[in-house]
């Protein structure tokens, strides 16, 4: 991979990073995921056995078992800007026992990958990106031609935005865009939407990087 850190990183709110570092130790207790709904999302990703996957905002590793069920020769780069979240994920999925998984502490804006991945996943994290347009641009660049970018939540946009609004100043203004706005951002960055669902149960948008 040509990846690494950008020499001009996007500044991230220290308060927001501190919020997630503080919550990491109890995250799995205070954040409940319906695993059947997560499985539904994983099923839409079209994971191939040799895919190279970039997961942004891995948290404590909720998606890792769903990737491992599909991968044979592939791998996962699991990224989070919270050092404590990565530490929690490593405890659950030690790299010696999970050789297909590697962890990286980094913000999305610090990444500088170029056509390195078949699949990029933002599960339950997109509202926390300060500049969502720039995030899509960076993640689209990380994809190989034909690769997929997925933004997904196992709840409705209305519920997600409401939870954030009532969660304190650190993430109180972290909202999902409308599905139409997200589709426009995808299109502007050479991505063709191949799956979308925006209802009371899910917010999912998956797009493929076009060949030209």
Go through the PLM ranges and name each one.
Residues 174-189:
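Short alpha-helix
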Residues 121:
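A conserved beta-strand element that flanks and buttresses the S-adenosyl-L-methionine
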Residues 54, 60-110:
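Class I SAM-dependent methyltransferase SAM/SAH-binding core
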Residues 2-47, 62-66, 85-88, 150-176, ...:
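Conserved class I S-adenosyl-L-methionine
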């Amino acid at each position: 991979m040509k990846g690494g850190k950008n020499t001009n990183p996007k500044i991230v709110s220290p308060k927001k990073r501190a919020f997630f570092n503080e919550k990491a130790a109890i995250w799995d207790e205070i954040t409940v995921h319906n695993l059947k709904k997560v499985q539904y999302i994983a099923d839409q990703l079209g994971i191939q056995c040799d895919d190279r996957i970039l997961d942004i905002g891995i948290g404590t590793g909720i998606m890792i078992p769903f990737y491992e069920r599909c991968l044979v020769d592939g791998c996962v780069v699991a990224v989070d800007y919270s050092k404590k979240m990565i530490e929690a994920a490593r405890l659950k999925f030690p790299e010696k026992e999970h050789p297909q998984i590697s962890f990286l502490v980094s913000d999305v804006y610090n990444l500088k990958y170029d056509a390195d991945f078949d699949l990029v996943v933002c599960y339950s994290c997109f509202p926390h990106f300060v500049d969502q347009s720039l995030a899509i641009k960076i993640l689209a660049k990380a994809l190989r031609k034909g690769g997929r970018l997925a933004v997904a939540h196992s709840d409705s946009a209305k519920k997600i935005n409401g939870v954030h609004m009532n969660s304190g100043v650190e993430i109180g203004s972290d909202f999902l865009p409308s599905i139409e706005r997200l589709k426009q951002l995808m299109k502007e960055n050479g991505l063709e939407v191949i799956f979308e669902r925006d209802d009371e149960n899910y917010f999912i948008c998956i797009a493929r990087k076009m060949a030209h």
